[in-house]
Amino acid sequence: MRRLDSAQADFEVQITALLRAAATRDEALAKQVADIIQAVRGRGDAALLEYTRALDGLDVTEPGQLEVAPARMAAALDALDADQRDALEQAAERIRAYAAHQKVSGWQYQDTHGNTLGQLVRPLERVGVYAPGGRAAYPSSVLMNAVPAQVAGVDEIILVSPAAKGQVNPLVLAAAAVAGVNRMFTIGGAQAVAALAFGTATVHAVDKIVGPGNAWVAAAKRQVYGQVGIDMIAGPSEVLIIGDGSVDPDWIALDLFAQAEHDEDARALLLGRR
């Protein structure tokens, strides 16, 4: 934990250095991400395998090893205890109900001149969902992104999530089954975003990429936007809490921890009075 005091003579220098460091890091990362995207776009599965071995530590030699069979997702769901399964299914049902109210429908009418006017609304054909799987696994990210796509009528939902230490979190697999994911790949980072954006022989190109990720994922989504749609640039997480002494410090600490856990680039700041 780093502590800055506005009473210190070098406070302005410290705060400026803190902000500048983030900008410098972002520039360097953007160049590395661009190289990864170019490699996957140009060499497809071969580059995807190389980056998955080097960055995710997954021992893969064939593109087919990257895909998770639907039966494996279903088995993970069946293996959950009753409470875990009920929690996932209840969450999915609540998200599904909310998304149904959000769903936009087409309409048309005929004006007084005999012209037929209206709006045609069609679901996307294919959507890619990114679910973090490095330092922590987030089955909630699977549900919050895949279930609305299913409600919208998307034909094919592709989930990508890195396998931490060669293992996919069973709750992520189970959430994929609950959410109706059609295909899943154990790939992550900028290379996964590139594969979804441009496609490879194994991973189909999608119309839109959704879901949160670390700085690499955020930078990659920013760079492929235009080639493919994205939801937003989510991450790295930043939160600033202004403490006025009116709240239980434990609550503040929990809020800070909730953001700081996302990745090493997350920033959880507390502004307080001396």
Annotate each language-model stretch with its function.
Residues 8-11, 26-33, 41, 48, ...:
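Generic structural signal for well-ordered, non-membrane alpha-helical segments
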